[in-house]
């Protein structure tokens, strides 16, 4: 029987996902007609991923709870913090140590970046090695610690607002549509995370005629301690409206 070492990075992932899975989450899914969006991306030579990230970040202005987290204040009381910046934690797949695994990189201050800058940053990060990623020194140190010290370290970081935002980000993004998945739930130690599924051609009835349109499925996972089900639904409905109404064109800086 073949065996694989349970390396430090796997143990770090384990500690992170333990904390993420402990959150009381609510999951909501919507399908979005992206006919206009697909044409927009082609005409402007921008990636769909970068456009989606930019739009998700923009929703924070109308729904600030979509970009928030719980940590301790100076009196050690739990407090909901609402950062001014949207720091998007993006899950990417890495190959290192003879293994494939997911890791998280944080894109800083999304609302200040253009779609092309976001796309270029993601593309650049995907071509880096594990040890070249931002904050790789800290993650390498975490990988070397015993499990109980990893748990203590993550616990301390999660309760200090500035450190939490810097290391974990404020909003999560994962895209697995290219593997044929329609929808999936994300596992981020964050208040809100988005799972982007694949694009499907769907038949709809519009203006008395049958039409085929491309649809994209987005699943939103929210921390129920901060975002109630109704508010989560409003956030997701706003995202759908922006995409289908074409309002994203006024939001995006190409």
Q: What residues fall within each predicted segment?
A:
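C-terminal catalytic/motor cores of large multi-domain enzyme assemblies
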Residues: 1-254
């Amino acid at each position: 029987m073949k065996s694989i070492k349970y390396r430090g990075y796997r143990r770090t992932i384990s500690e992170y996902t333990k904390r993420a899975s402990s959150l009381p989450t609510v999951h909501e899914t919507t399908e979005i007609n992206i006919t206009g969006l697909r044409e927009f991306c082609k005409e402007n030579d921008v990636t769909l991923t970068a456009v989606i990230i930019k739009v998700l970040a923009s929703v924070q202005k109308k729904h600030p709870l979509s970009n928030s987290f719980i940590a301790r204040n100076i009196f050690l009381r739990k407090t909901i913090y609402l950062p001014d910046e949207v720091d998007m934690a993006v899950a990417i797949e890495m190959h290192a140590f003879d293994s494939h695994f997911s890791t998280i990189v944080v894109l800083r201050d999304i609302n200040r970046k253009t779609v092309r800058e976001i796309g270029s940053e993601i593309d650049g990060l995907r071509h880096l090695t594990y040890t070249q990623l931002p904050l790789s020194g800290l993650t390498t140190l975490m990988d070397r610690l015993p499990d109980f010290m990893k748990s203590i370290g993550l616990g301390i970081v999660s309760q200090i607002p500035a450190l939490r935002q810097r290391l974990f980000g404020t909003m999560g993004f994962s895209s697995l549509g290219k593997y044929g998945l329609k929808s999936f739930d994300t596992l981020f130690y964050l208040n809100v995370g988005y799972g982007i599924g694949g694009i499907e051609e769907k038949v709809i009835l519009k203006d008395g005629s049958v039409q085929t349109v491309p649809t994209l499925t987005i699943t939103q996972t929210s921390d129920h301690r901060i975002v109630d089900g109704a508010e989560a639904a409003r956030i997701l409905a706003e995202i759908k409206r922006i995409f289908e109404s074409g309002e994203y064109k006024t939001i995006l800086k190409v």
